[in-house]
């Protein structure tokens, strides 16, 4: 927006005026103001992205209500941008997790991978057809996939999820991502924001990545991942990439991203006003860009400090100590 651009230009002017190395106090103020602007900018843009993705999923819901594709639940903003920080000032990627529920006549069975590890990375989602004979008799909106002849099903009903987005009996990440990407391309014109943004679907085998450009040539990068919830927990089997060289398309690694974003939102309500925990995270994340050190490891360390350090110790005067 114009306001964002004006604030950014004002900050740049202050930075150029404050380059006297003897004036450390002014530089500290400029840095603090810069980080505060970045955090506020992330919050406002995150809200824009959430609204846009919500409208997109609403179109999906309307057009796929009678299908046998996965049921898409409201997206959950995850990752650094929705936690209030980012290792990058430009080209921030706004990540969202779209929970999947089984369509009618299907159930999901989560087969967790190797036990005993901190994060299970080789889990699968088995798709099983369930009997809907009672529904067929009472509602009459579908034929039972289990007890009707294949020929009748082929003639009178769309294919089951097993025949569209699965490999064998398992939900396929890459087929799901490609299906979603193709649907976004065809459904975008119906989304209200299509009048304000030019949309491009970027290559991705395990998610849906969008590049949105407005009339001012400002760009938003959005990545939608998919996940199936483990019971009532905040742990999901997700489509996110792993560090492995090769990840089978039927592999859905565990993700704690939803639990982590909830942790940061909870802490935001507990810490003192003007807490510096996000400023510390933002500063170190920027410093570590290009070093090969994992920003996820850095975030984990800050999360540990937030639970082990008295919350009163995150005030502005504690900034250098916390660093």
Where are these regions (language model features)?
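N-terminal regions immediately upstream of nucleotidyltransferase
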Residues: 1-94, 98-170
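Catalytic cores of NTP-dependent nucleotidyl/adenyl transfer enzymes across multiple folds
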Residues: 85-86, 120-323
């Amino acid at each position: 927006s114009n306001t964002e651009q004006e604030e950014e230009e004002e900050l740049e002017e202050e930075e150029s005026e404050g380059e006297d190395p003897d004036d450390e106090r002014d530089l500290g103020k400029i840095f603090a103001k810069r980080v505060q602007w970045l955090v506020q900018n992330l919050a406002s843009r995150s809200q824009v992205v959430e609204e846009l993705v919500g409208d997109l999923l609403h179109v999906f819901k309307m057009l796929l209500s009678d299908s046998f594709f996965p049921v898409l639940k409201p997206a959950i903003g995850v990752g650094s941008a929705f936690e209030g920080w980012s290792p990058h000032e430009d080209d921030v990627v706004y990540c969202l997790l779209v929970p999947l529920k089984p369509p009618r006549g299907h159930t999901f069975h989560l087969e967790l991978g190797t036990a005993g590890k901190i994060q299970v990375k080789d889990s699968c989602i088995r798709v099983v057809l369930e009997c809907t004979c009672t529904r067929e008799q009472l509602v009459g909106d579908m034929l039972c996939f289990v007890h009707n002849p294949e020929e009748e099903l082929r003639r009178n009903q769309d294919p089951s999820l097993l025949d569209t987005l699965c490999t064998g009996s398992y939900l396929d990440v890459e087929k799901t991502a490609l299906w979603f990407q193709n649907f976004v391309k065809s459904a975008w014109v119906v989304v209200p924001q299509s009048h304000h943004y030019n949309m491009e679907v970027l290559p991705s085998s395990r998610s849906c990545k969008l590049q949105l450009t407005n009339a001012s040539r400002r760009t938003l990068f959005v990545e939608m991942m998919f996940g199936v919830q483990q019971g009532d927990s905040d742990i999901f089997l997700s489509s996110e990439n792993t560090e492995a060289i090769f990840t089978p398309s039927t592999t859905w690694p565990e993700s704690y991203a939803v639990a982590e974003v909830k942790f940061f939102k909870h802490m935001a309500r507990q810490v003192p006003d003007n807490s510096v925990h996000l400023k510390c995270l933002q500063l170190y994340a920027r410093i570590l860009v290009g070093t090969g050190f994992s920003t996820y490891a850095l975030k984990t360390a800050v999360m540990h400090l937030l639970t082990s350090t008295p919350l009163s110790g995150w005030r502005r005067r504690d900034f250098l100590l916390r660093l």
